[in-house]
Amino acid sequence: MYQLGDVKKIVLPGDPVEVQGKIRNGIYRGPDNKYYSEYFGTLQVSDQYVDVVPFSGQYIPRKGDKVIGKIIEVGPSTWTVDINSPYFAMLHMNDTPWRISSGDLKRYLNSGDYVYAKIMSVNEIKESWLTLKEPGLKKLEGGHMVLIHASRVPRVIGKGGGMVNMVKELTSTRIIIGQNGLIWIDGPIEGVTMAIAAIEMIEREAHTEGLTVRVESFLKELRGDKDGNQQDKANQ
């Protein structure tokens, strides 16, 4: 059972990694056909994938931050939440908008569910507690998740929210950005696909100037290509 203060398994470059699902990031196969870690970071294991996330790409929790987290364990009165940090966060049933009886937590949030929550406290060793008891905080239903480097979040949001609002408008999607680098996107599949491509572009080119204009042109070109193809079919 995970408890407050538990740390994910830390691996070093070259450490052997047991792989039972698909490998995604930070793992390579050696000449002996065994798998090894590529980074100094934490081992992330799910039912389908195994990753090693480098410490340089992980989020350090701060009081007041709004984050997206994944429920990974349900206890009698608390949920354990993965917030893309070396430490797991905790959510107590009293810090939700629901009236919950102890032991009945799975009716509201189960393993694999995502929440948009606020960090209400962090201690000196970065153990954190979450809350859902503020407007806008909630369980996230449906949608698609994208993970970016937490340091790129301000660039995705843009000055005064300009960048993300432009992406939402041009893709007809709803987007919620966690300050820990997790982003939730919902809407028509075409729009979601375009929004993901735009966010990946922003992360990749975050250090460059004139990015807002390029992202806008990129999305308009994608929309124009789609509209153009539909027009061609209509004229046939």
Swiss-Prot record:
InterPro entries the UniProt entry points to: Exosome_RNA_bind1/RRP40/RRP4 (IPR026699), KH_dom (IPR004087), KH_dom_type_1 (IPR004088), KH_dom_type_1_sf (IPR036612), NA-bd_OB-fold (IPR012340), Rrp4 (IPR023474), RRP4_S1 (IPR048565), S1_domain (IPR003029)
Entry superkingdom: Archaea
RNA-binding found in the keyword field: yes
GO molecular function terms noted in the UniProt entry: poly(A) binding
Domain S1 motif: start-end pairs: 64-133
Any one GO biological process: poly(A)-dependent snoRNA 3'-end processing
Domain KH: 141-199
Keywords: Cytoplasm, Exosome, RNA-binding
A GO term from the CC aspect: cytoplasm
Gene3D superfamilies per the UniProt record, alphabetical: 2.40.50.100, K Homology domain, type 1, Nucleic acid-binding proteins
Entry's localization field: Cytoplasm
Pfam families for this protein: KH_1 (PF00013), RRP4_S1 (PF21266)
Cross-referenced SMART domains: KH
Family: Belongs to the RRP4 family.
Assembly description: Component of the archaeal exosome complex. Forms a trimer of Rrp4 and/or Csl4 subunits. The trimer associates with a hexameric ring-like arrangement composed of 3 Rrp41-Rrp42 heterodimers.
Function: Non-catalytic component of the exosome, which is a complex involved in RNA degradation. Increases the RNA binding and the efficiency of RNA degradation. Confers strong poly(A) specificity to the exosome.
Name of the protein described by the UniProt record: Exosome complex component Rrp4
Organism: Thermoplasma volcanium (strain ATCC 51530 / DSM 4299 / JCM 9571 / NBRC 15438 / GSS1)
